[in-house]
Amino acid sequence: MDKRKYTVIDLFAGCGGLSLGLYQAGWNGVFAVEKNPCAFETLNYNLIENKNHFDWPEWLPKEPLDIIEVNKRYRKELKHLRGTIDLVAGGPPCQGFSMAGKRVEDDVRNQLVFAYIDFIKMVRPKLILFENVKGFTYAFDKRKHPDAVPYSKVVIEKLQMLGYNVKPQIIDFSQFGIPQRRKRFILVGIRNGLKGCADVFFEKLESEKKGFLEKRGLAEKVTIVDAISDLLRSNGEIETPDRKGFLSGLYGNEQTAYQHYLRSDSINIIPNSHSFAHHTKEKESCFENLLLNYPIRGKRIDGENRAPWGIRQRGITVLDPNAVAPTITGLPDDYLHYSEPRIMTVRECARIQSFPDWYEFKSKYTTGGKLRKKEVPRYSQVGNAIPPLFAFQAGLVLKELTNG
């Protein structure tokens, strides 16, 4: 058994998807930086209070933290960590880069990229695991700014200047046992002078995934029905413990290896965050009609196609049970359940993101209006996360690189 202690700091940790996967792979957290109180509440409950994943230094408060403030306030302490940190993991929030939303060039969140580089410069970890949306590799409007370069190029050049051998790649998480088409920019860096090169990470990740999944009884390709068929509303309902006036679904029997894997360590009788949305009769009737009559599954109903089907919202996708899901976002109204006239629950989204059922989400379920800029409710926490099952696989490969 490997008794070596592998140390990691998680930046922009969100609700903890990356930290969870690294924890499962045997990494020991030093601390995590997450600014949003909603996401931090989930991270704190699952991995700080209850799993003791983090050693957490006395000089750093266990509370929501802004990386820019951490860099300013604790420069001396961060520099003292040099030589003790194996890995700095994480990537800045995606809203400023994502192709799914409006790309905002002067978005203050984009400044977080440079705070990330500053942090790396101070701590000098052996390894870097950087994750972001695919849109991170695209420059802003070339017509307005002919000299614009993508942020990915900036990060790569800055890390190389700091003395890291880096390798970026676009990864589709559906190729790693996760029931979701989710393409992300992944960059691995190894500090110059250490054995190995960053290219090896992606080679090993690919060559070792089959054995990893087989060892856990999991398939490489997992469909939506494989992930959530035990969470049907028809299993029965009960009052939601943490959401007054709403009903939650009960567990059905495990039907797949994927369900067994994610349920195996849960002691919950009622699935956490499996609370059903309130739909008007008009909307429920619209959903029933779509399930019965709409001919195409897994493709967004958008634009002029909406009106004939009574869709008033911006668009919706009727999920195909026998395919992987589209990219899970923070907006619950994007997807219609494959067999029931309702949107997906937080727990169903979490299953598709590969969170185990023991992992409990905290704070509000949804938000809206101006609060959307401040709050990160449960749906958004799940939609923003790195799938733990991928992070688990990445964590095992990174341990190999640490050992040379």
Residue map of PLM features:
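Core alpha/beta nucleotide-donor-binding catalytic domains of modification enzymes
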Residues: D2-L127, V133-K153
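Short, solvent-exposed loop/turn segments at secondary-structure junctions
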Residues: G16, C38, P93-Q95, K134-G135, ...
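Short, well-ordered loop/turn elements at secondary-structure boundaries
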Residues: W27, R181-R182, P321-V324
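A generic secondary-structure signal for well-formed alpha-helical elements
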Residues: L47, P92, T137-F140, L159-G163, ...
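Class I S-adenosyl-L-methionine
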Residues: Y74-R82, F97-R306
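C-terminal target-recognition/interaction regions appended to catalytic cores
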Residues: S248-G404
